[in-house]
Amino acid sequence: MGVFMTERADLVFHNKVIDGTAMKRLISRLIDHFGMGYTSHILDQSKILGFQQATATSISLGIDDLLTIPSKEWLVQDTEQQRFILEKHYHYANVHAVEKLRQSIEIWYATSEYLRQEMNPNFRMTDPSNPVHLMSFSGARGNASQVHQLVGMRGLMSDPQGQMIDLPIQSNLREGLSLTEYIISCYGARKGVVDTAVRTSDAGYLTRRLVEVVQHIIVRRTDCGTIRSISVSPRKGMTEKIFVQTLIGRVLADDIYMGLRCIAVRKQEIGIGLANRLITFRARPIYIRTPFTCRSTSWICQLCYGRSPTHGDLVELGEAVGIIASQSIGEPGTQLTLRTFHTGGVFTGGTAEHVRAPSSGKIKFNEDLVHRTRTRHGHPAFLCSIGLYVTLEGRDIIHNLNIPPKGLILVQNGQYVESEQLIAEIRAGAFTLNFKERVRKHIYSESEGEMHWSTNVYHAPEYPYGNIHLLLKTSHLWILAGASRRSSIVSFSLHKDQDQMNVHSFSVEERYIYIFDLSMTNHRVKHKLLDTSGKKDREILEYSISDRIISNGHWNLISPSILQDNLDFLAKRRRNRFIIPLQYDQEREKELIPCFDISIEIPINGILRGNSILAYFDDPVYRRSSSGITKYGTLEVDSIVKKEDLIEYRGTKEFNQIQIKVDRFFFIPEEVHILPGSSSIMVRNNSLIGVHTRLTLNTRSKIGGLVRVERKKKSIELKIFSGNIHFPGETDKISRHSGILIPPGTGKKNFNQSKKELKNWIYVQRITPTKKKYFVSVRPVVTYEIADGINLATLFPQDLLQEKDNVQLRVVNYILYGNGKSIRGIYHTSSQLVRTCLVLNWDQEQNDSIEEVHTSFIEVRANDLIRDFIRIDLIKSTISYTGKRNDTGSSGLIPDNGLNSTNINPFYSKSKIQSLTQDQETIGMGTLLNRNKECQSLIILSSSNCSQIGPFNGSKYKNVTKESENIIPIMDFLGSLGTIVPKIANFYSSYHLITHNQILLKRFLLLDNSKQTFQVLKYGLIDENSRIYSPDPCSNIILNPFRLNWCFLRHNYCEETSTIISLGQFFCENICLFKYGPNINIKKSGQIIIVHVDSLVIRSAKPYLVTLGATVHGHYGKILYEGDRLVTFIYERSRSGDITQGLPKVEQVLEVRSIDSISMNLEKRVNSWNECISRILGRPWGFMIGSELTIAQSRISLVNRIQKVYRSQGVQIHNRHIEIIVRQVTSRVLVSEDGMSNVFSPGELIGLLRAERAGRALDEAICYRAILLGITRASLNTQSFISEASFQETTRVLAKAALRGRIDWLKGLKENVVLGGIIPVGTGFQKLVHRSRQDKNIHLEIKKNNLFDLEMRDILLHHRELFCSCIQDNLYETSEQSFTNS
């Protein structure tokens, strides 16, 4: 009491209400001043006082005491309003799903936290004596979080995968939950209904598997006699408390000295006193015995196991420690979380620092040092590439704010900001990167339809044969509405007579090749769909004649339109041409040209210049399969050589104006063999041979004649000239000439001393074998007459040739090979000598020169039939090059000049020019493919999928005209995608205008009421970047950018601003159509498919925003069903510790399914150890030591990983339990070679100790390597087949055991239980092992082991200098790996 009086002056007098925190502080000070005994007396007095007062006041808890916070209602309303705006942004595709989720979570989290903070002040002001308030905030019972759920709102919950559900529970427990909120709350908490049920079943199955692995592990001996041990020392980050727990209950494997004094001896059990002494003295690494060091895998000894956790003494003999270990690990699994609770970026304070404006003013910064980006919520922002100063100019003061690199500026340059407005966000430093994880989020289609994207994509390299594409930039993905092909009747027709249906441009990556089989009877066409983009095994889908679709009562035959190869083939093999095969037509049987051999030849980029080849026809008459020489340069008449002008080779694809007439040309056949240089030739040079003469061992001649042999560097060229040999006299004129053609009817002088008339052309060639001697070869000649050009009327229908335009078409025949050019017909190839070409040209006006034209294929519906046209758009190149041109020719796949056919030698024969009537600017070229079919499509639109906007007739608005001398680029892209929805204005494009009488082409369409324009109907796909895509779902073709948005301006360079509606353009919902004029909004997102004079028809579409790096599942134009996977986003989110936590993490490690697989590291270590040690010690020692060291490292790594998971959840498990499990998982090795086929077979799993004993006993080494088995696999690889069969795969296990003749020694618990025997534990233990025999075995084994150990030590000491550094380095690396991985 005297002490109390002396220190009373130091104590502070408290006269206030104290809560739980203040009570803790008071108790702490009482203990410091008075000690434990006196403090407990004081606390007892306060407890009694509290009970007395509570009894007197009779405070009780009732449901009426739970008062909801008044501000909750308007807070939730405000949050709902924000969420509604967010939903609208998502609906308009301004943000994507991940950004929406993040933002939604943050909004609700902020609301919930605000309500939590409001709770205490609200109680204090309204009802300070509220029992709930008194109970929770005094610290008596309950915490703020629990009371918040009672009177505030439950807030956000997680789904079973650990993702936050963005639909919060707005109600509190006082108000009651709705059915949806109740189900979400069942998932939500750690003690939730669903969580508990699933966790119990998972933990139960884990326990069962663990029991299967270690049920036979029993303490059978006191000491196994091992000298092995494991060194333990406090690891980095390990607390002293955990290290003490690791030591207590273990047995020392070696003596411990402090200087010369021994403080602990071998085989001594470590208690709490010894453990504290070891830590205090900081003893060197302590060597202890663990289950890893025990000499047998089928049992364990007392000293290796250590203290029993039940009674605090050494474990008793006969105790089933394996069962205890498996239950110790499995049972706490019900306390572990099944998942990690992620907030999806809720706690922004930890990851980013906000910068707010100190006062109101104007923001200024250097725009050159920033670039546009998006925040993680989808808001527009500027990313600072380097450190940047932002100036805030207020009325009286100027503030300079420093934004570090990678900071985000959230306001625009020159924007006025209010005080405390958020202007920038500074990202956290590099140390937070370790706490992030990359997560995938899959987005599924909400409706059925056709997929289109509006940017370039590239094929994912890891899926070479799949349909997965990666996005190169932020853009929109559209799902165009439409029912699937399963619908049989089309209820709504969009296209009227002579409407344009489709546009095919020429930047095509065609995924299907259509094969026409014209050999079928009755001229039925069988169509095969051949997939070229898939794997090597191509799948052919056949559509029979009966496979039809009913459309408006007309039969629909699925027939393909254009034969187009894959893009690679187009560039290399097809020489940039598109082939349109024509169907067989009975009416054209008698015509000279079979129509199905005509091919269209158009460059990939679709641009043709003047005098370009548009189409060609290879006449089979001019096709030769044999070798020979073409001649048309010199002719001889009446033995007088007349040399006509030779036609020079012009290396250009354009036709020159001067044409030289060649009526005929000649082909001189010959047989050519190109043989390897080492071939042995059986004929002599300049000798005459007959037909079928053997030339080499494997080659015979097809014709007889003169043999010419010419040796080259690496080959031998052997030619055989058919014909006669003539030895001329002195008077022969012909001897002076070599290589001349003689026409028929010429006198043949001195040939065989007679004079005859020649019936056919012959070719005379002088051959000089020696300087003095020579002779003449007279060879037969094949003569080809070149026919006149084909009349255009045979190619194109008459009605279309009557159109007025200024385009000229002429048919030109030209020879593909030059004069004297040799043609090699080797390996059964044929050569085309003459090609008939359709040459395109147009009239050039003086003031209006057009240099090039754009070509495209279109489909036009006419009288319920589809007609295919080639559309040619004349382009004025003087204006159009001012804007940015993105021609696909520069993409690297196709050369810019399109038709770069180097093997075409333009020798022109007769040309027949047919001028078509002039006046207009276009040509409507008729069908090359005249198909009789109704409009068919696999996507069927109904009236519910389309909406009409208009009419616009009553609207009056003015056009804004601005005079300018310079050329003004028309395209105007506004900001980054997702910030401002771009105004749909200033889009110029080419339009096809169709009326019922003529086919015309205009360059643009102005939706202007003052200019009553024309009926425009075009069906194509043009995205917001004005790229045209083919909507033909049969072919699934993707069309890369084929730009039609040329910057057309008037001649006076006057820019006229009007609303330009592009056909095929995509609109987001709620966009105003007209900038100046009537307020007409689009009510639905979609694509314009029909433009009338006074209205539009829009096909409904659902837009999705996708960002850079997102993965798109499916090809362009793919038909998706509701619920199909559409996009996968990869994003980062905060994590705590591990990506996978709780029970799945434990299972992942025990089944060896880790992401950074331990087994991979294990394999590398084994190989490195085997290499080093086998080289020095030989194979048996090398394999043994390598496997031992590797397994030891892996065991420690596994134990640390599992303990880390349990400790993170607050569950304490002793290491020895985990060690028993891990020992069984790592106790097997895999026989890798057939070293001793009569002992072990390759691939057999054997115990490590058994392999070591066999290796020492046998002369030959057994090659094996360490392997990690998962617990399931380890359960099926035990010594008892009865135990294995009772776990899984009963039939397979028993059949295998019968075939191998396995014996089960019934040493475990389970097999004895199955057979009804006494289990060998507890009282039944002594029946299995006799004590006397056991002691005897122990003595012998200790002796043997020590001898072996001494031998090993001698070997290692002897070779220490040789390989010590190698082993230490490798051991250091592997141990570092194991500890860092753990």
Swiss-Prot record:
Keyword Nucleotidyltransferase: yes
GO biological process: DNA-templated transcription
Residues that, per the record, bind Zn(2+): 224, 294, 301, 304
Cofactor binding note of this UniProt entry: Binds 1 Zn(2+) ion per subunit.
Coiled-coil annotated residue ranges, if any: none
Chief site of localization: plastid
Cofactor: Zn(2+)
Catalytic activity: RNA(n) + a ribonucleoside 5'-triphosphate = RNA(n+1) + diphosphate
Top EC class, one word: transferase
Similarity field: Belongs to the RNA polymerase beta' chain family. RpoC2 subfamily.
Protein function: DNA-dependent RNA polymerase catalyzes the transcription of DNA into RNA using the four ribonucleoside triphosphates as substrates.
Subunit structure comment from the entry: In plastids the minimal PEP RNA polymerase catalytic core is composed of four subunits: alpha, beta, beta', and beta''. When a (nuclear-encoded) sigma factor is associated with the core the holoenzyme is formed, which can initiate transcription.
Name by which UniProt lists this protein: DNA-directed RNA polymerase subunit beta''
Native organism: Dioscorea elephantipes (Elephant's foot yam)
UniProt gene name: rpoC2
